[in-house]
Amino acid sequence: MNMEEIVALSVKHNVSDLHLCSAWPARWRIRGLMEAAPFDAPDVEELLREWLDDDQRAILLENGQVDFAVSLAENQRLRGSAFAQRQGISLALRLLLSHCPQLEQLGAPPVLPELLKSENGLILVTGATGSGKSTTLAAMVGYLNQHADAHILTLEDPVEYLYASQRCLIQQREIGLHCMTFASGLRAALREDPDVILLGELRDSETIRLALTAAETGHLVLATLHTRGAAQAVERLVDSFPAQEKDPVRNQLAGSLRAVLSQKLEVDKQEGRVALFELLINTPAVGNLIREGKTHQLPHVIQTGQQVGMITFQQSYQQRVGEGRL
């Protein structure tokens, strides 16, 4: 089977990830579980010669790994990681949706579209690796593209979903190809007249600082963070800075944060997997807790904040049970 046929078969079986190496049988991940795939692994070296450019091949040789994205036929796009291991080069491939998903299809909290109307501020999407953060960000961009007149600038590593400008002008920049780092791309973005800035990941204190500055100066910033809950996301941002800077960062965050959407995936009774969400909205009470460093109280605020649209993972779980999904 060629790669297009493999991907078509994977889509048919709701595969999320493919693992390929010429030294052992192909495997794929379905509903979170790794299984043997019903096809022989293609020649990984040949695939990489086709998919990687000269710079990416040089990175793979020098660092032993490289991240990339590639488009195949039928508008199918893959996010890939090629890495050297004892038995040769391996490929881990994540299948991306061939279309921009709708927030309603993901079961996102109903208040999220209203939050996306904010003219400035920071909205975080958090969760473990493989929890669907990129898909949710893509749905947010898709919503804005249909409902807002704005300039959206994305900084991604690599570019995953490809957007066609509709009501919005959308420009996508890839780290390592169009700019060197998230921080340098974000610094440049402040001079490029965006209304919305999408950051693939908040990786370091410099990027976090610039993101907060952008959020304070009239931009809506959408970004991801690897944490398992909303309260942990706030703590992670603050803890990225030395002790003497924590209080100023708390003040910035208390003023500029709009919401933290955390998510995780569970096996769906019907098909594939279903997302569970936790949503923290920055109300005046939440802002005060952030400012005072009392993030341990945030879970209680979320639990009692349903009237403004907040939701806990447990409440989200009960909704999915009621829908017959879990």
Residue ranges and their predicted role:
Residues M1-L326:
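Short, flexible helix-loop junctions that flank or precede catalytic/ligand sites
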